[in-house]
Amino acid sequence: MKKILFTVLFLGGLVSLRAEEVPDSLSVQKKVTIEEVVVTGTRNETDVRHLPMTVSVVNREQIEHRNDPSLLPLLTEYIPGLFTTSRGLMGYGVSGGAAGGMSLRGIGGVPQEGLPTTGMLVLIDGHPQYMGLMGHPISDAYQSLLAERVEVLRGPASVLYGSNAMGGVINIVTRKMQQDGIRTHANVGYGSYNTLQSEVTNRIRKGRFTSIVSGSYNRTDGHRKDMEFEQYGGYAKLGYDFSSSWKLWGDVNVTHFNASNPGTIQVPLIDNDSRITRGMTSLALENHYEKTSGALSLFYNWGRHKINDGYKTGEQPQTSHFNSKDKMLGISWYQSATFFTGNRLTVGFDYQHFGGESWNKVLATGERKPGVDKQMDEFAGY
């Protein structure tokens, strides 16, 4: 976060009977800028000035001023070259008629309704966050209550993060509590089309122990018939500092949303509804010394999707609904050291397992017709 320190030089003197013209003291100012420290594009915390790529940072103050339950509208406003598609007052949905497509500098996703983003990677605390079966991010899962700040690497990052980062990388850094004490924040808003957004967060730090618990509920009827959206979710994070150099933390986030797609005005749809549940959890042990730093982390993401593709006026309702389950888990270890000025050596290992299964459930009989069932493993050392 950029901090701006102002030093005002005040020129004064003893009171005198003779008036004397002096310059305006407030016009003499000095501004000092403290650069941001980021973790995107490198494993360890690094001054953004020392990175060979372009990284933009959105801080917590900017997130709170925007007062939006989703991070994407905020990022579209603050990040140059980032574009996202939208379709209504709240929510993006999935499958046909979905929005939330992302692109950076024209690369990432196809700006067409219903087509997923495949060239933009979203991370939470450095862990990949996308559907394990389809391989695309779920835009409604990236909520403002999670984020302490958001770091956006603009431009190709496939060497660091894989082929699904051709457009860039969005890294959501989760909330922290730096000072001792208890902080509770609540926010409720109500507006047009029966739109409600609410959030409550409690943060505690007592000595070496920290905790964060957040919950939210958001809904809207939408500006068209059959365009309702409802979402509720929760986030919890616990941490413990063993010393000034070693810390352990773990977190869990679960969100569920119901989204309806009315189709186009020319060709409306009936009962095109989706019921989506997404979850993620992670555990990390970190060390920070003057000359070296590193971490061992584990993460697990999962999802459950139920989708009714709906039908057009004059057609028959769907006789079966699409269902899917997906997961993604991984282990990451790295250690970075500096031996002399301008040098840094990092060694590490990453393992990821992802995949899932899909099926169509016949409504009349409950029969399950299998679709895709795929699992994959990836590992690499560096």
Task: Annotate the PLM regions.
Residues 319-382:
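Outer-membrane beta-barrel transmembrane domain signature of Gram-negative proteins
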Residues 169, 174-204, 214-215, 220-225:
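Short strand-turn segments of transmembrane beta-barrel domains in outer membranes
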Residues 220-227, 231, 245-328, 366, ...:
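Flexible loop and strand-edge segments within Gram-negative outer membrane beta-barrel domains
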Residues 55, 63, 75-76, 150-152, ...:
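Non-catalytic regulatory/gating segments with a bias toward low-complexity or hydrophobic composition
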Residues 20-64, 72, 288:
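Short, acidic, small-residue-rich periplasmic hinge/interaction motif at the N-terminus
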Residues 179, 206-209, 243-245, 255, ...:
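Outer-membrane beta-barrel channels and translocator barrels
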Residues 119-120, 126-154:
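Short acidic/polar hinge/loop motifs at secondary-structure boundaries
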Residues 76-127:
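Extracytoplasmic beta-strand/coil segments of soluble accessory domains associated
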